[in-house]
């Protein structure tokens, strides 16, 4: 197990109980001007260790690149795979869906600890030197155990900075700069600086190549729920992605990552298009059927004319899949505009 020097005590920003798929767990910030990052790497040059890192107010020092990594949530697992460190994954948990096809070979033999949050005992049995989580609540008493406990046992923990829930650590809004900063920082932690730089450069180029729609279309980001829909609000990954595509979010005024929005409010907003989140537990097709049988939404032009865009659930949380989601949704939107 890699040595760990604790740089600071837990600052009290551990999350509350674990939430289910699609829940508004991370208090992420959304698009627009850059917000201060809640994570900070040491001033050491790239590739230098020891390396001090901080996420959500919890500081630690990695004495060397971790060799035994446990990830919780798809965003964390896919980040490690994308940076070429999949052979150091000794366990994963809480997958939100299949990994991208290009990462599937590297993920094929990685052990799966649990469908949701693993027990802390199961994690510790693997003797990890890093536990990397996508949600702050993944590392809590109701999740895979408190971060302080891991610290006391010499195990480093890291939470996606966009997922910090404490007001003093949470970015005001999610931006692509913050997403790419996480790629850079995780690359430094893993000793994969070059791979991280290449991924960041590729994603910046891909994002720059996207031409947002200028049609002024409004959109509803429909994640889950039938009695009351659960939708993308104004400061998280859905807002960031819609901005990049050129869609006006009908729930942009809600200062949260996700929110409940009554069907009557949806009907009043009368969105031009509906973005459907496709998850194994709540498919895009199921959401189409829900919209078509709901008397409040069945008469909406977007529903009657099937003006739908589809995005996979793992791409809806801050991570390396956000930029590809922009490219894909922009292409879908262009086809939809031609069809109209």
Q: Predicted segment positions?
A:
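Bacterial Sec-exported substrate-binding components of ABC uptake systems
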Residues: 1-77, 185-222, 332-340
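Short helix-initiation/N-cap motifs at beta->coil->alpha
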Residues: 53-57, 111-121, 141, 254-263
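A short, structured surface patch at a secondary-structure boundary
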Residues: 68-126, 130, 135-139
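Alpha-helical, coiled-coil/dimerization segments enriched in small aliphatic residues
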Residues: 96-98, 231-259
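Extracytoplasmic ligand-binding site segments that recognize negatively charged/polar headgroups
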Residues: 98, 137-145, 155-185, 216-239, ...
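Proline-aspartate-enriched helix->loop->beta-strand connector
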Residues: 120-133, 263-279
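Structured C-terminal subdomain patch of bacterial secreted/periplasmic proteins
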Residues: 173-182, 273-340
């Amino acid at each position: 197990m890699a040595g760990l020097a604790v740089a600071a005590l837990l600052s009290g920003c551990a999350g509350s109980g674990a939430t289910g798929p699609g829940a508004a767990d991370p208090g992420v910030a959304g698009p627009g001007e850059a917000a201060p990052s809640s994570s900070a790497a040491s001033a050491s040059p790239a590739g230098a260790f020891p390396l001090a890192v901080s996420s959500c107010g919890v500081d630690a020092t990695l004495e060397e690149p971790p060799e035994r990594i446990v990830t919780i949530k798809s965003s964390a697992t896919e980040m490690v795979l994308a940076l070429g460190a999949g052979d150091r994954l000794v366990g994963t948990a809480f997958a939100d869906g299949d990994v991208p096809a290009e990462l599937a070979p590297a993920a094929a033999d990685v052990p799966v600890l649990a469908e949701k949050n693993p027990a802390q005992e199961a994690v510790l049995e693997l003797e990890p030197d890093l536990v990397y989580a996508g949600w702050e609540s993944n590392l809590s008493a109701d999740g895979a155990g408190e971060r302080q406990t891991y610290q006391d046992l010499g195990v480093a923990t890291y939470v996606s900075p966009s997922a910090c829930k404490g007001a003093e650590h949470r970015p005001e809004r999610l931006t692509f700069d913050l997403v790419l900063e996480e790629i850079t920082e995780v690359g430094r932690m893993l000793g994969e600086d070059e791979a991280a730089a290449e991924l960041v450069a590729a994603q910046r180029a891909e994002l720059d190549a996207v031409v947002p729609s200028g049609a002024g279309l409004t959109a509803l980001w429909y994640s889950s729920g039938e009695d009351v829909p659960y939708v993308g609000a104004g400061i998280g990954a859905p807002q960031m992605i819609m901005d990049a595509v050129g869609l006006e979010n009908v729930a942009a005024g809600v200062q949260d990552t996700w929110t409940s929005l009554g069907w009557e409010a949806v009907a009043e907003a009368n969105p031009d298009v509906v973005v459907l989140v496709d998850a194994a537990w709540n498919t895009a097709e199921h959401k189409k059927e829900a919209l078509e049988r709901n008397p409040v939404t069945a008469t909406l032009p977007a529903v009657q004319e099937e003006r739908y865009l589809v995005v996979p659930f793992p791409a809806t949380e801050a991570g390396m899949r956000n930029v590809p989601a922009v490219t894909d949704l922009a292409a879908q939107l262009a086809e939809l505009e031609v069809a109209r």
